[in-house]
Amino acid sequence: MKIRPLHDRVIIKRIEAEAKSAGGIILAGTAAQKSTRGEVLAVGTGRILDNGDVKALAVKVGDKVIFNEGYGVKTEKLDGQDVLILSETDILAIVEA
């Protein structure tokens, strides 16, 4: 199945962080926090401005990003894996290698 986000929406696959504490102890279950890093799988056409123009998004497919997981972030299943659908404004940074 293919999902195409609309407008300023972005589809992200979460990149799971290793569940270790600062002291090197492996955390289990609820002690491990979900990662807020992911890879952009698809982007919408852009944000519609008040004057009707469309502003292209700053992120592109393949970008590694840090995002804010909060109100408005939707989790969906895509080909058996969880993906996140969120607005570009929920993306805090692009991680450059």
Curated annotation (Swiss-Prot):
Keyword Chaperone: yes
Cellular component terms per the entry's GO annotation: cytoplasm
Subcellular location: Cytoplasm
Transmembrane segments: none
Principal localisation: cytoplasm
Keyword line: Chaperone, Cytoplasm
Listed InterPro entries: Chaperonin_GroES, Chaperonin_GroES_sf, Chaprnonin_Cpn10_CS, GroES-like_sf
Pfam family of the protein (one): Cpn10
Top-level taxonomic group: Bacteria
SUPFAM superfamilies: GroES-like
CDD domains found in the cross-reference section: cpn10
GO MF annotation list: ATP binding; metal ion binding; protein folding chaperone; protein-folding chaperone binding; unfolded protein binding
GO biological process: chaperone cofactor-dependent protein refolding
Protein's job: Together with the chaperonin GroEL, plays an essential role in assisting protein folding. The GroEL-GroES system forms a nano-cage that allows encapsulation of the non-native substrate proteins and provides a physical environment optimized to promote and accelerate protein folding. GroES binds to the apical surface of the GroEL ring, thereby capping the opening of the GroEL channel.
Record-stated family: Belongs to the GroES chaperonin family.
Protein name as it appears in the record: Co-chaperonin GroES
Gene expressing this chain: groES
